[in-house]
Amino acid sequence: MFGIVNSMSYICGMKNQLPYCKTSEAIKGYSESSIAKNETNDCVVKSIASGFEIDYDRAHQIVKEQFNRKDKKGTFGFIPKMNSMSESRERIGRKCFQIMGKKSIYGYSYSLSYNTIVKGEIVKRQMTVGTFIKKHPKGTFIVCVKSHAFTIKDGVVIGNKEDAIQKRKIIQSAWKVGS
């Protein structure tokens, strides 16, 4: 009986989660990389590698040089730097990328908010990961939520397992790769 309950909760749990691919399967050279084995706080490196289809070690080098990332320390200022690179049409691994959303009135950030109707009233909502995938089922996107980055490729989340489970996380910024 316990096994049936366990398998049923697993099946039901799958319904509430987005399609997910392990970084080790999605990133070229990830499993073989000695750098990856010793690295922590490398979500930006993983998102660049999977989003731009380059190997992990090359992505690590790019993030270190372009974003001034220190080993095992995370990437600070990622969103403004990506926006700046996108606006100046710089490429990463031979691919261009485009900022998603509308430019804010302050001019330095972009908003992915949208209007929806709730009980006859127009309400402004912040874009969540789940809504983003519904609105953008095809394409490759680098996505930032609070203090974290990952890739969404053709509706499949590439990053940490939690990224596919936490569908209601608000997206702070996103870039479409290859546009």
Q: Which stretches of residues belong to each language-model region?
A:
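Intrinsically disordered, low-complexity segments enriched in small/polar residues
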Residues: 8, 18, 28, 104-108, ...
